Amino acid sequence: MTNIRKTHPLLKIINSSFVDLPAPSSLSSWWNFGSLLGVCLAVQILTGLFLAMHYTSDTATAFNSVAHICRDVNYGWTLRYLHANGASMFFICLYLHVGRGLYYGSYTYSETWNIGILLLFAVMATAFMGYVLPWGQMSFWGATVITNLLSAIPYIGTDLVQWIWGGFSVDKATLTRFFAFHFLLPFIVAALVMVHLLFLHETGSNNPTGIPSDPDMIPFHPYYTIKDILGFLIMLTALSALVLFSPDLLGDPDNYIPANPLNTPPHIKPEWYFLFAYAILRSIPNKLGGVLALVLSILILAVVPILHTSKQRSMMFRPLSQFLFWLLVAVLFTLTWIGGQPVEYPYVIIGQVASILYFMILLVLMPLVSIVENRLLKW
């Protein structure tokens, strides 16, 4: 008799995706982040659902409802901090996942890569709207500053901003719609994840060498299931440690002050995972130019497959490209640091240099160095 997992209409889909899926035998721990992101999404949806049962999306009560969750709801503080720090873990895994794709040339699977970029935008939008919900000072002013950037769009900008706000400033209507979209978007993300996996399973996984692995495949279960479970345990241990020992480490103390439209915080900045993009935005003196640079800082990932000039897929055997890759990582760390600093000398100039370097490495230096490496190999 054939096993039910191979005949049942639903189980056979799961079987072909997670059990009998042929996978390259050489996948390193860098391939764990896809499944870790799945766990992050599940944790965020579950904790978010329980938080939404107690949260009120009204300007008069939003801040107090979050305080009520932390003080009066059973394990409400755990839920709240799991959700807030879970977002940080989500972005750590996201950036490492994208970095892995860049390093090992996974972007040559263009459909999977492009859906991934769409997912990145969707998760960023979700995180931004979630940050507004506690209705603290940084929530309110962050929402005001970031939504106001849309006014830089010629002709329709001002109308667009007022349409998003639902009035002439960030107010009750804005908070209510942000809550609605913050609740809805993770389910759209979950649907996009399915499409992401669908396209991935059309081609099969890449591997660290970048060489086709068809002759050397192993079943996903038990080899990679057990490896993924180890990854889950490590990540959930790190998240638990963060939540239980220093839950406010990655947050902003200003967000414990209720939102006040009459009092601007001394330094408005987003959560740490957006600081690199915020630094790029601020490094251009022109408003529209800054907004374009902000969008392009993520959208630039879409042109990476087009600019792939190397005859090898992975950077594993390309030391010059490796140097540029790690330089890019250093530039991103620099931008993240600059995004959290005030707008004054010398931070402004450091941010501008780092922003130019960021775009230069991806658009100019990497394609050129790949051509040089091809020549060095006498291909």
UniProtKB/Swiss-Prot annotation:
<dbReference type="InterPro" id="IPR005797">
    <property type="entry name" value="Cyt_b/b6_N"/>
</dbReference>
<comment type="function">
    <text>Component of the ubiquinol-cytochrome c reductase complex (complex III or cytochrome b-c1 complex) that is part of the mitochondrial respiratory chain. The b-c1 complex mediates electron transfer from ubiquinol to cytochrome c. Contributes to the generation of a proton gradient across the mitochondrial membrane that is then used for ATP synthesis.</text>
</comment>
<dbReference type="InterPro" id="IPR036150">
    <property type="entry name" value="Cyt_b/b6_C_sf"/>
</dbReference>
<keyword id="KW-0496">Mitochondrion</keyword>
<feature type="binding site" description="axial binding residue">
    <location>
        <position position="196"/>
    </location>
    <ligand>
        <name>heme b b566</name>
    </ligand>
</feature>
<dbReference type="InterPro" id="IPR030689">
    <property type="entry name" value="Cytochrome_b"/>
</dbReference>
<keyword id="KW-0813">Transport</keyword>
<feature type="binding site" description="axial binding residue">
    <location>
        <position position="182"/>
    </location>
    <ligand>
        <name>heme b b562</name>
    </ligand>
</feature>
<keyword id="KW-0999">Mitochondrion inner membrane</keyword>
<protein>
    <recommendedName>
        <fullName>Cytochrome b</fullName>
    </recommendedName>
</protein>
<dbReference type="GO" id="GO:0006122">
    <property type="term" value="P:mitochondrial electron transport, ubiquinol to cytochrome c"/>
</dbReference>
<comment type="subunit">
    <text>The cytochrome bc1 complex contains 11 subunits: 3 respiratory subunits (MT-CYB, CYC1 and UQCRFS1), 2 core proteins (UQCRC1 and UQCRC2) and 6 low-molecular weight proteins (UQCRH/QCR6, UQCRB/QCR7, UQCRQ/QCR8, UQCR10/QCR9, UQCR11/QCR10 and a cleavage product of UQCRFS1). This cytochrome bc1 complex then forms a dimer.</text>
</comment>
<comment type="similarity">
    <text>Belongs to the cytochrome b family.</text>
</comment>
<feature type="binding site">
    <location>
        <position position="201"/>
    </location>
    <ligand>
        <name>a ubiquinone</name>
    </ligand>
</feature>
<dbReference type="Pfam" id="PF00032">
    <property type="entry name" value="Cytochrom_B_C"/>
</dbReference>
<keyword id="KW-0479">Metal-binding</keyword>
<feature type="transmembrane region" description="Helical">
    <location>
        <begin position="347"/>
        <end position="367"/>
    </location>
</feature>
<feature type="transmembrane region" description="Helical">
    <location>
        <begin position="320"/>
        <end position="340"/>
    </location>
</feature>
<feature type="binding site" description="axial binding residue">
    <location>
        <position position="83"/>
    </location>
    <ligand>
        <name>heme b b562</name>
    </ligand>
</feature>
<dbReference type="GO" id="GO:0045275">
    <property type="term" value="C:respiratory chain complex III"/>
</dbReference>
<keyword id="KW-0349">Heme</keyword>
<keyword id="KW-0830">Ubiquinone</keyword>
<feature type="binding site" description="axial binding residue">
    <location>
        <position position="97"/>
    </location>
    <ligand>
        <name>heme b b566</name>
    </ligand>
</feature>
<feature type="transmembrane region" description="Helical">
    <location>
        <begin position="113"/>
        <end position="133"/>
    </location>
</feature>
<keyword id="KW-0249">Electron transport</keyword>
<dbReference type="InterPro" id="IPR016174">
    <property type="entry name" value="Di-haem_cyt_TM"/>
</dbReference>
<feature type="transmembrane region" description="Helical">
    <location>
        <begin position="178"/>
        <end position="198"/>
    </location>
</feature>
<dbReference type="InterPro" id="IPR027387">
    <property type="entry name" value="Cytb/b6-like_sf"/>
</dbReference>
<dbReference type="GO" id="GO:0046872">
    <property type="term" value="F:metal ion binding"/>
</dbReference>
<dbReference type="Pfam" id="PF00033">
    <property type="entry name" value="Cytochrome_B"/>
</dbReference>
<feature type="transmembrane region" description="Helical">
    <location>
        <begin position="77"/>
        <end position="98"/>
    </location>
</feature>
<dbReference type="InterPro" id="IPR048259">
    <property type="entry name" value="Cytochrome_b_N_euk/bac"/>
</dbReference>
<dbReference type="InterPro" id="IPR005798">
    <property type="entry name" value="Cyt_b/b6_C"/>
</dbReference>
<keyword id="KW-0472">Membrane</keyword>
<dbReference type="GO" id="GO:0005743">
    <property type="term" value="C:mitochondrial inner membrane"/>
</dbReference>
<keyword id="KW-0679">Respiratory chain</keyword>
<feature type="transmembrane region" description="Helical">
    <location>
        <begin position="33"/>
        <end position="53"/>
    </location>
</feature>
<feature type="transmembrane region" description="Helical">
    <location>
        <begin position="288"/>
        <end position="308"/>
    </location>
</feature>
<dbReference type="GO" id="GO:0008121">
    <property type="term" value="F:ubiquinol-cytochrome-c reductase activity"/>
</dbReference>
<keyword id="KW-0812">Transmembrane</keyword>
<dbReference type="InterPro" id="IPR048260">
    <property type="entry name" value="Cytochrome_b_C_euk/bac"/>
</dbReference>
<keyword id="KW-1133">Transmembrane helix</keyword>
